[in-house]
């Protein structure tokens, strides 16, 4: 918490936080998130919050960008990510969030590169706005208003 407060003393327009709530108990984690929300509202501060726990980001972020192996694979407003995840890695991150209701729990499976590659979404150029390409077949496409995903363009 002291490191976070120290960053705000410099009056920076943006603060970058890398897993600031990891290894914190639930009460302290909630206090840190509440502090960040208050300071964000009061100072109009932009926060780049790096985390693999999407449930932590849900209450804090306006937009979520999901990266896998150094590549952006999905980006959308927070509620779109939670309501309609498209990329298999985004889906796996959301499935990793613990569920209180036993009927909603799924048996977790390990995903690897071959699973990701074989489950990349496929879209026709006629159905989406093509944004950019990494190679000849994989591109970054807009599938909905401000919802972008890495996909195979066919």
Predicted feature locations:
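A short, proline-enriched helix->beta-strand linker immediately N-terminal to the Walker B motif
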Residues: 9-13
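Catalytic Walker B motif of ABC-type/P-loop ATPase nucleotide-binding domains
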Residues: 15-19
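Helical segment within the ABC ATPase nucleotide-binding domain
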Residues: 30-43, 55
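Conserved H-loop
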Residues: 44-50
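A short, surface-exposed alpha-helical micro-motif characterized by mixed small hydrophobic
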Residues: 57-59
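ABC ATPase "signature
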Residues: 72-76
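Short catalytic/signature loops enriched in Gly
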Residues: 78-154
């Amino acid at each position: 918490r002291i490191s976070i407060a120290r960053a705000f003393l410099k009056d920076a327009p943006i603060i970058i936080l890398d897993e600031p709530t990891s290894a914190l108990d639930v009460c302290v984690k909630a206090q840190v998130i509440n502090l960040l929300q208050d300071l964000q509202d009061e100072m109009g501060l932009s926060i780049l919050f790096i985390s693999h726990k999407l449930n932590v980001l849900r209450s804090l972020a306006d937009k979520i960008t999901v990266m896998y192996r150094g590549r952006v694979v999905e980006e959308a407003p927070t509620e779109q990510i939670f309501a309609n995840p498209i990329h298999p890695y985004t889906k796996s991150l959301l499935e990793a969030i613990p569920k209180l209701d036993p009927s909603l729990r799924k048996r977790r499976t390990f995903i690897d590169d071959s699973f990701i590659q074989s489950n990349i979404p496929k879209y026709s150029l006629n159905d989406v706005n093509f944004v950019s390409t990494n190679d000849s077949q994989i591109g970054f496409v807009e599938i909905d208003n401000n919802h972008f995903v890495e996909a195979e363009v066919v």
